[in-house]
């Protein structure tokens, strides 16, 4: 099967998320800590804290801004898609937890 298709690209991104988990920690905990740090830093500007899924989306936006200022690279695209996957995963966890309560 060709590796030059969207499905192969997404499988590669899933592998990257797994690999980075070994060095950066679990994706859910990482985004929760990031959200808390951003909420503390932005404190008086915000009316409510940033959620973990919002932090993941904002990390994706960071990748978009890098692509807008420089060039689009495969790595930036992988990271952008990966952060979207983290946001989606966080929302699934949140939705499941709300169903259980």
Spans of features found by a protein language model:
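Intrinsically disordered, low-complexity regulatory regions
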Residues: 1-101
